């Protein structure tokens, strides 16, 4: 178990789980900026921050005469590919968060990305997992079990509100049944007893009125149905699109970080320096340096792809879109900063611990962080103590599962 990789994964997941917070602020929702416009602010922060990383490196590089043979910057095409995966993932997130909510969007994207990443890198790319003996020519793996537990915890976090509602409904139904049985027993005793108890009759008839399961008037039912995006005719298609794009966004996020690990592995094989970097050429080492050339190349790719999309949007509209500077100069910049922090730590974690296990840990932390913001900051969904209790239990279960999953990867 690489504890430094786990720490990077948790820090990255917390940052990634926080950046959607600024997508659904009241000002942003009211302004309704185009997803590409919001992405432009994020890409600009990523582009500029990459060059900020080079400033302290340039100072050390210029003062150290022994490092003149080591280049300050080496362009990396794998970073461009990673950025090409990142842009769609970001666009799908920006589109779906205001529709289905921050907690559900992150949970859906994390679940799809976690399953795809683990299966692809274990079964296709050959990431080794610990096996356990069960006899002669018999072995089994615990990694799929812990992956299943991680996904189960994710699903529980997603549907914690609905589960709470079902539990509360079951308890209320039982209370109503007990009150109805008490009422029937009282009426049966009155039938056998010649004494008329008017007071008891009045008490029995009002039992249902004090029940927490009070009947909703038909008009109110219709209004609730029409205002719910999951059930209304107008909102169901948009809600479904938000759910679908959240799942697809998780798949693109997996490709973003897959380009880091697989690209580095391919280049090391071509340079005959796998698995240790000490014998690799200086240009190869620098091109995949998270603090330097890799991030600068990623920022260049992100900005280039975003500008191309913006040009296409302008051509389709016949004019430049509204950039909403007064609103997005704060929200877009903050979202970009938290994404930069998340990408920085997650890239470190992937390079240190591999993609198969690290991404499951990152995505689990993202779900817990976004869920906390949804419960505490935005007050999303049911705020009852029962729902919070179920959510905490599911969060702890998910954390333990992802830690145990980390122990299953063979460290090399």
Regions found by a protein language model. Name each.
Residues 1-412:
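Polytopic alpha-helical membrane proteins, predominantly small-molecule transporters/carriers
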